[in-house]
């Protein structure tokens, strides 16, 4: 153990403790000389070499996967063209889907806004009153938490609905002439109506706490688009597989429950050690949630996070190309298993 030592010389003040040492230069002389340091143990923490090796291997593997995905990108672009050519039909189906979702209830579409709002209030009460969560940096915990849970609501709702879209619209899947590849987009647009309402809610709540609309906050458009792309890419895989493996719907629900806490939404990732933080950041929704907080609270542009941005879009590219390939392979058998 190192006993705390505090001293002062003509040129500097110093303090050596068991956690390190502090040196303050006195005057304008930028040069100091330290001598006669003995019987001192200085603990220097550094990254283990295995960590650098693993990161290098992960980068090479991801680069190889992305390169392979790019080779099939040209064929996959035709898949997107189907949605563009049928945008009018998608808009009409999305409106009907949103209305029909709550058609049998007295309050109708109002439930689409009440359910997320009640959930927000419950989580807010648990974290602020129960766990007594403090402010995160300079941001009040309430606005920090809500700006993170709003995009998660959209992701969770959209992924659940798109994964089951071919089962729900089975009568359209059986029609030979209908382009069923537009159906996941229908569900995403349907979920977007509620999301836009809660984005306005963030603006209003932010103004209450002194976070007024500016150019940074307009980035929600970019991050919303990025989240739509992410859901669409994942849904190509899940909606195709779930027809053959119905248990996938339950598995997705479990993953989303874990994902809420692992993104994380209600607590800050700074509580974790460095290497664990990097593992958590591999979750693409971490990029989205952080992006919303950067837009409304931290005032950080998305291009100021270049590595996270490149990684996110690389994941989307790989998921999209794999999803299109899987969809095309399984599509001829859809009508047989519905």
Task: Name the predicted role of every residue range.
Residues 48-338:
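Hydrophobic transmembrane alpha-helices and immediately adjacent juxtamembrane helices
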Residues 2-31, 38:
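Glycan-recognition and processing domains
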Residues 29-53:
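Short, aromatic-rich amphipathic segments at membrane interfaces
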């Amino acid at each position: 153990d190192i006993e705390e030592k505090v001293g002062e010389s003509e040129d500097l003040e110093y303090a050596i403790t068991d956690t390190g040492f502090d040196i303050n230069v006195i005057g304008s002389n930028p040069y100091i000389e330290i001598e006669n340091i003995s019987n001192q143990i200085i603990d220097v923490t550094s990254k283990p070499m295995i960590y650098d090796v693993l990161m290098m291997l992960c980068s090479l593997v991801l680069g190889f996967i992305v390169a392979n995905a790019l080779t099939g990108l040209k064929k996959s672009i035709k898949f997107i063209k189907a949605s563009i050519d049928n945008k009018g039909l998608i808009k009409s189906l999305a409106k009907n889907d949103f209305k029909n979702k709550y058609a049998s209830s007295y309050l109708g579409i109002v439930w689409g806004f009440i359910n997320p709002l009640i959930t927000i209030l419950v989580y807010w009460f648990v974290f602020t009153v129960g766990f007594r969560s403090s402010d995160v940096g300079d941001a009040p915990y309430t606005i920090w938490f809500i700006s993170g849970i709003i995009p998660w609501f959209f992701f969770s709702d959209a992924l659940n609905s798109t994964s089951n879209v071919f089962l729900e619209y089975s009568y359209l899947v059986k029609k030979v002439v209908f382009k069923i590849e537009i159906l996941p987009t229908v569900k995403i647009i349907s979920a977007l109506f509620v999301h836009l309402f809660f984005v306005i809610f963030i603006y209003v709540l932010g103004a209450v706490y002194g976070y007024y609309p500016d150019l940074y906050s307009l980035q929600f458009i970019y991050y919303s688009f990025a989240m739509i792309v992410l859901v669409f890419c994942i849904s190509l895989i899940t909606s195709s597989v779930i027809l053959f493996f119905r248990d996938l719907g339950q598995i997705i629900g479990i993953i989303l429950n874990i994902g809420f806490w692992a993104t994380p939404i209600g607590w800050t990732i700074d509580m974790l050690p460095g290497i664990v933080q990097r593992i958590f950041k591999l979750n693409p929704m971490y990029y989205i949630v952080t992006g919303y907080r950067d837009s409304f609270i931290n005032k950080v542009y998305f291009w100021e996070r270049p590595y996270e941005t490149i990684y996110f879009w690389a994941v989307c590219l790989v998921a999209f190309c794999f999803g299109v390939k899987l969809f095309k392979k399984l599509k001829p058998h859809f009508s047989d298993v519905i």
